[in-house]
Structures are given as C-alpha cells and as structure tokens.
C-alpha cells in the first residue's frame, strides 16, 4: 500500500520555467540505483548546484532560497516532465519532499508515472498558473491547500478547480499502487487459482 493522499497543505516554490525535461529533474549520471530513495539529493542537480557532484549550492536557484526551504508544492510552467520516460523523475521529486506539482500541462508519461508514485500533478490553465505565480511572488512563503477529494486548490482568497481521472483519484485517495490494487482482489485470484487443474499450480 502507498501513502494515502486526500488533502495536503504545503509551502509553494515557484519554478518559472517551461519544458522542464526529466534530465533537468534528475540528470542521467544519478540513475544507477533501482530503489526509489536517495534521488532527492540530486533533484535539479545542474540548476541547484554549481558543481557536478552537488556540493556547492547555487544561491540564485529558487529551491535554495531560504524562504522556500521545506517546500512540498512545486508551481511550474507548461510541458513539465518532457523528455525521456524515466520514472526516476517523480522518485526524485517525492524523495525531495514534493507532494504536488501544479502546471498548465505535463508530458504524458511523466503524468502517469506521477500517479504511480503518489505525486499529484494538478493541471490548471495558463491564466490560473500566472495568477498563482503572481501570488507567490507577492507572498513568498505562502502555503496552498490541495484537496484531492474536492478537486480544488485553495490559494490565497481564491479557489481553483481541477479534474483528475476517477480511477487515478480513487487510487491516490486510498493509497493504492499496482500491488495494492492486486491485493484488493486477492480472494478472487486465490479462488480462480484453486479452480485450475493441479498441474497448472
């Protein structure tokens, strides 16, 4: 079972860049591991750090600003997660501490991989995202409330509606990954297997 996602209130960090690809999210030299942990240290490595090893923070990159330390909601621009289809990208984002990414659009494969890893991709219009960027710029350190059950984001005095496929929404709210979904049908699977001839078991 994965962690359940119903509502989340978190600090918002604005990454004002379009077409952020998966190589920018987690560079290829850090992909050797097959477990989901440890990638957060290298999230946006080429932007966050001045050196390849990730030892010297870049003071001009937004994730390194003190007011955004501990951010769990990433606000960004269109076509986020484009490029190669590495699942390490949502792994790096969640390992860093992000629960939600808000953007006008996402690359299809990244979008699907996000749900598989309990990272909620929220799609809003360009105009709505523009409003949010202005709000965060005027109020650095602001928090947004994301309610998956009601499918709304509360930002300042405004509420923004979004839509998530019913099946994906159900899985996130109930903390169901592919294993969890299979276990929901464990009794039916066992009953089916018991009906098979002995040589098939």
Curated annotation (Swiss-Prot):
InterPro entries (alphabetical): 3-IsopropMal_deHydase_ssu, Aconitase/3IPM_dehydase_swvl, AconitaseA/IPMdHydase_ssu_swvl, IPMI_Swivel, LeuD
Covalent S-S links between cysteines: none
EC assignment: 4.2.1.33
Superkingdom to which the source organism belongs: Bacteria
An example Gene Ontology molecular-function term: 3-isopropylmalate dehydratase activity
Enzyme class per UniProt: lyase
Catalytic activity, reaction form: (2R,3S)-3-isopropylmalate = (2S)-2-isopropylmalate
GO biological process, any: L-leucine biosynthetic process
Segments forming a coiled coil: none
Gene Ontology cellular-component annotations: 3-isopropylmalate dehydratase complex
UniProt keyword annotations, A-Z: Amino-acid biosynthesis, Branched-chain amino acid biosynthesis, Leucine biosynthesis, Lyase
Pathway field: Amino-acid biosynthesis; L-leucine biosynthesis; L-leucine from 3-methyl-2-oxobutanoate: step 2/4
CDD domains attached to this UniProt entry: IPMI_Swivel
Role this protein plays: Catalyzes the isomerization between 2-isopropylmalate and 3-isopropylmalate, via the formation of 2-isopropylmaleate.
Annotated family: Belongs to the LeuD family. LeuD type 1 subfamily.
Subunit description: Heterodimer of LeuC and LeuD.
Protein's name in the database: 3-isopropylmalate dehydratase small subunit
Gene that this sequence comes from: leuD
């Amino acid at each position: 079972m994965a962690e359940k996602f119903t509502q989340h209130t978190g600090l918002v960090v604005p990454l004002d860049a379009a077409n952020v690809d998966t190589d920018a999210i987690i560079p290829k030299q850090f992909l050797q591991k097959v477990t989901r942990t440890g990638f957060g240290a290298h999230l946006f490595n080429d932007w966050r750090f001045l050196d390849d090893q990730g030892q010297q923070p870049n003071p001009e990159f937004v994730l390194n600003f003190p007011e955004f330390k501990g951010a769990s909601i990433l606000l960004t621009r269109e076509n986020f997660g484009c490029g190669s289809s590495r699942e390490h990208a949502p792994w790096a984002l969640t390992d860093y501490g992000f629960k939600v990414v808000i953007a006008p659009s996402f690359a299809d494969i990244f979008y699907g991989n996000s749900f598989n890893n309990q990272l909620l991709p929220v799609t809003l219009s360009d105009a709505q995202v523009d409003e949010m960027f202005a709000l965060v710029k005027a109020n650095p350190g602001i928090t947004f409330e994301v309610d998956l059950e009601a499918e709304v984001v509360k930002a300042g005095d405004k509420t923004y509606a979004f839509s998530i496929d019913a099946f994906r929404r159900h899985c996130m709210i109930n903390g169901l990954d592919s294993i969890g979904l299979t276990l929901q049908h464990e009794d039916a699977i066992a009953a089916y297997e018991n009906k098979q001839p002995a040589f098939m078991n």
